């Protein structure tokens, strides 16, 4: 059975997790054997979106209905997701990379180390420039912080320079990237991070 790199993708509802997953799956499947697991509380809507967008073949996308608190399924009791990962590994012997998208959650959500090797945490500019300084494990401890929707900064009165300063202060040396996932801005930097930090040979 393969031992793929497992990448957790977290962040609040509407921050752009599924949009990021679409980009990463579409781009990275050209070089790697990729699968994705999505978590929704009561539906498999994110699985449907990913499938409809053509980001990956349908058989490489699995939806997990978590019920209750979405962070429990990625942290305290990750059994459903671990079972889904194992299912994908059995399905695709050559699997090199698997994305696990959490259900929309708050800033305190984190992935269990047994579930994810690397974590990406997505926040968005439209939620206000104060978001980075609010902290929380997703912002301070994720392997890569993705600050999405930079195009909306002028519309919501957010100063990206202030967000950058706050992020540097909250994260220290941990990396972050600004993105506009509508256009794909910043996606290349995220892929480069995953390849380098995840030890993926091109």
UniProtKB/Swiss-Prot annotation:
Highest taxon, organism lineage: Bacteria
Subcellular location as annotated: Cytoplasm
Keyword Nucleotide-binding appears in the UniProt entry: yes
Subunit structure: Homodimer. UreD, UreF and UreG form a complex that acts as a GTP-hydrolysis-dependent molecular chaperone, activating the urease apoprotein by helping to assemble the nickel containing metallocenter of UreC. The UreE protein probably delivers the nickel.
Gene Ontology cellular component terms for the protein in this record: cytoplasm
Gene Ontology MF terms: GTP binding; GTPase activity; nickel cation binding
Binding residue positions for GTP: 11-18
Family statement drawn from the similarity comment of this UniProt entry: Belongs to the SIMIBI class G3E GTPase family. UreG subfamily.
GO biological process: urea catabolic process
SUPFAM superfamilies in the record: P-loop containing nucleoside triphosphate hydrolases (SSF52540)
Encoding gene (name): ureG
UniProt cross-references to PANTHER family, sorted A to Z: UREASE ACCESSORY PROTEIN G
Key words, A-Z: Chaperone, Cytoplasm, GTP-binding, Nickel insertion, Nucleotide-binding
Lineage summary: Bacteria, Pseudomonadati, Pseudomonadota, Alphaproteobacteria, Magnetococcales
Record function comment: Facilitates the functional incorporation of the urease nickel metallocenter. This process requires GTP hydrolysis, probably effectuated by UreG.
Pfam families: cobW
Record protein name field: Urease accessory protein UreG
Keyword presence, Protein biosynthesis: no
